[in-house]
Amino acid sequence: MDKKQKKQKMNSISTKTGDCGQTSLANGERVAKDSLVMEVVGTLDELSSWVGLVIAHLEDNFSSQEDILSQIQQDLYQLSAVIVQAPQVKFKKLALDQLEEHSAVLEKEMAGSWQGKFLHPGGTKLAAQLGVA
């Protein structure tokens, strides 16, 4: 899948209604922008951004890892939708199972190179970015 094909469609970035420090959830409920639910959604969004940065720096021979990371981004997006109570989105156990499977695949591919060692982020720009993600 081409990296440019993975973009999500967004209708608008502004509601033009003002906010007084509040925002609306998908179900219409108003919450403070510094509420726990918005903190969690913001953290998931930040994680997705870091994963996207890692994807952007992957070389062509890492297509299977790119597919896994792209699926993780999609899962984070859906999890955020569940958290803000979007009624049309359900985060299924299958997605959590897939996340565990992806982790196992990545661990197997790296076996022997890191297990049992304390890891320091860095070494390469991509490794440092993956450490942040």
Spans of features found by a protein language model:
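Phosphate/pyrophosphate-binding loop motifs in nucleotide- or prenyl diphosphate-using proteins
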Residues: 2-133
